[in-house]
Amino acid sequence: MEKMPAKLLFERSIIGNKGSVIGKVKDIVFDEKVGRLVSLEVEPAEHSPIMREEGRNVLIPYKLVVAIKDVVVIDETNLNRVNIRVAEH
């Protein structure tokens, strides 16, 4: 994937590679020690396939991202194989 400023990710829609609407990017989690983006903080869409707690965002591992253009595309076939946590604030 090509490089882009992190601020361009905010409020982008997230779509699964099978067509599901996942949600919107609200924040990012960056590991300064290794210099990598670790997770996307996501506000789940109403009918998103990810489990959600009312009013709480979730963290989706960045390794699921397959493309970033006008939307962020994630590998939704592996959503149930990764640890999706509730974002702490």
Swiss-Prot record:
Top-level taxon of the source organism: Archaea
Protein name, as recorded: Uncharacterized protein MJ1118
Biological classification of the source: Archaea, Methanobacteriati, Methanobacteriota, Methanomada group, Methanococci
A Pfam short name: PRC
